[in-house]
Amino acid sequence: MSLKILLAEDDNDMRRFLVKALEKAGYKVLSFDNGASAYDRLREEPFSLLLTDIVMPEMDGIELARRATELDPDLKVMFITGFAAVALNPDSEAPRDASVLSKPFHLRDLVDEVNKMLAA
């Protein structure tokens, strides 16, 4: 069974690149352009990893991650953002063990980071 990744990223081009890179690495990826839609899907089926941008319409990535890990405490979370400081702020409600990949990044780095998280 391939591991499933839920991707929330509001930038269409970025979302397409990420899906392509992760599928090529052997993952099954479902992607959404906002946090609210991603959360609705998460309530329907389990995922191994939530990969989310932080700044998005309707529900930001930190809120999405908070709600998602309430729903499934075993869900791993990775933020992809240009605002790494926001996710790493200890006062934020981001899950403590979430990892952060700052934009810009190479797709290879993303895949390596995802592989590491899902192997843990």
Place the predicted regions along the sequence by residue.
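Charged docking surfaces used in two-component/phosphorelay signaling
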Residues: 13-24
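C-terminal output helix
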Residues: 105-115
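Active-site residues of response regulator receiver
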Residues: 53
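Short hydrophobic/Thr-rich beta-strand motif most characteristic of the beta2 strand and flanking loop
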Residues: 26-33, 41
